[in-house]
């Protein structure tokens, strides 16, 4: 469960809310005066929050939990607050906000900073840093990190234990690399990035040419001469891999969010603020537009162009361009196995049934 602040560090609700990043948010309290405001030590779900925690309601399916939650305060939409007032419901201080999920996110950021301090700057004695590497002020380099020739680490960046920063690579200011992140040579990460453990950026793209001089069916390697460029405010999940370009660079735009275990092949371009869920595979030279969302385990073929504002449902196989914004789904619905077998048998006969139907129409 989330870590609670020590009792002596608990904050009055209005003081806590005044201390968060309120950009783009407008909120007010339902409590009549400051004397009624609880002191807050943490944040939790409606079902798990205690009487010293704040919670939130952003999904209507959990609205019935408002009646049973022990939370000291709950973030709700204006409609929910009005409905509770009309019903005469009481018992909780309400934080009324048009965007409760975003306000919850800002509170979670505050509690993370309060409960998980970054630790002091400095280079661990076991780290190996090439003399030509540049490390700006307030950088923290963890145990057994390797920073190769010509690499640069920007101000305030933090490298967890065992990270490898290849020759000529750059890590932007205030970025966080969790333990065992690997940046090959020529990988450039922007500011305020978060890269989770096991991620590998800049490995060779999958490039081979048929070469009969090496033997029947043999393949000759095509050196991958491009780089990887990651924008600002990007998050990359654990064990995600982003290959370097063959000639042009592989590019991840500003604000992109990549979940765990995603494969981004060489020369792919991902537009700003696109979010991609776990286990997605993106084949080489595909371009994905801005503000797209791609559901988990989807597969995108190579050399495709995906428009801006496209939403791809989980498990979809995309094999052709998508030129228009909207939601796209290519998933065969699950069913009981016996029913699925019957439906699959019918699908296998569709071409035959189509021919027979056309023959009947001609009669």
From Swiss-Prot:
Which EC class does it fall in?
A: transferase
In the Enzyme Commission scheme, what number(s) does this protein have? 2.3.1.191
Could you say which protein family the record assigns here?
Belongs to the transferase hexapeptide repeat family. LpxD subfamily.
Tell me what this protein is called. Answer: UDP-3-O-acylglucosamine N-acyltransferase
Which residues constitute the catalytic centre?
266 (proton acceptor)
Summary of the function given for this chain in its UniProt record: Catalyzes the N-acylation of UDP-3-O-acylglucosamine using 3-hydroxyacyl-ACP as the acyl donor. Is involved in the biosynthesis of lipid A, a phosphorylated glycolipid that anchors the lipopolysaccharide to the outer membrane of the cell.
| One matching Pfam family | Hexapep_2
Note whether Lipid metabolism occurs among the keywords. Answer: yes
**For this UniProt entry, what's an example GO CC term?**
membrane
Entry's PROSITE patterns? HEXAPEP_TRANSFERASES
Keyword Acetylation belongs to the record: no
Q: Which reaction does it catalyse?
A: a UDP-3-O-[(3R)-3-hydroxyacyl]-alpha-D-glucosamine + a (3R)-hydroxyacyl-[ACP] = a UDP-2-N,3-O-bis[(3R)-3-hydroxyacyl]-alpha-D-glucosamine + holo-[ACP] + H(+)
Q: Which domain of life is it from?
A: Bacteria
- Gene Ontology biological process terms, A to Z: lipid A biosynthetic process
One GO molecular function term? N-acyltransferase activity
Q: Name the UniProt key words of this record, in alphabetical order.
A: Acyltransferase, Lipid A biosynthesis, Lipid biosynthesis, Lipid metabolism, Repeat, Transferase
Q: In which pathway does it act?
A: Bacterial outer membrane biogenesis; LPS lipid A biosynthesis
Q: How does it assemble?
A: Homotrimer.
């Amino acid at each position: 469960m989330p870590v609670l602040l020590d009792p002596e560090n608990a904050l009055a609700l209005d003081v806590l809310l005044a201390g968060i990043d309120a950009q783009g948010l407008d909120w007010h309290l339902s409590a009549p005066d400051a004397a009624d405001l609880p002191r807050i030590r943490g944040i939790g779900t409606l079902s798990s929050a205690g009487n010293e925690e704040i919670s939130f309601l952003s999904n209507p399916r959990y609205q019935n939990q408002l009646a049973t939650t022990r939370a000291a305060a709950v973030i709700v939409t204006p409609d929910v607050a009005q409905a509770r007032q009309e019903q005469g419901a009481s018992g909780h201080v309400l934080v009324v906000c048009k965007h409760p999920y975003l306000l919850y996110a800002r509170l979670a950021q505050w509690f993370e900073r309060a409960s998980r301090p970054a630790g002091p700057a400095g280079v661990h004695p076991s780290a190996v840093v090439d003399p030509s590497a540049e490390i700006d002020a307030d950088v923290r380099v963890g145990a057994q990190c390797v920073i190769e020739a010509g690499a640069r680490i920007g101000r305030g960046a933090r490298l967890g234990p065992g990270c490898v920063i290849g020759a000529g690579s750059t890590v932007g200011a205030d970025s966080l690399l969790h333990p065992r992140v690997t940046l090959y040579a020529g990988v450039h990460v922007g500011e305020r990035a978060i890269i989770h453990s096991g991620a590998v950026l800049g490995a060779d793209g999958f490039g081979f040419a048929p070469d009969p001089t090496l033997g029947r069916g043999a393949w000759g390697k095509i050196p991958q001469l491009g780089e990887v460029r990651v924008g600002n405010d990007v998050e990359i999940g654990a064990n995600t891999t982003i290959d370097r370009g063959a000639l042009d660079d592989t590019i991840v735009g500003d604000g992109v969010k990549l979940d765990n275990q995603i494969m981004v092949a060489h020369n792919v371009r991902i537009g700003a603020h696109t979010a991609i869920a776990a286990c997605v595979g993106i084949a080489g030279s595909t371009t994905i537009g801005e503000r797209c969302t791609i559901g988990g385990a989807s597969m995108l073929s190579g050399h495709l162009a995906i428009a801006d504002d496209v939403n791809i449902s989980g498990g979809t196989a995309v094999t052709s361009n998508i030129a228009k914004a909207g939601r796209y789904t290519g998933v065969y619905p699950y069913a009981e196995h016996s029913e699925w077998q019957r439906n699959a048998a019918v699908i296998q006969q569709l071409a035959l049934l189509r021919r027979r139907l056309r023959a009947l129409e001609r009669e």
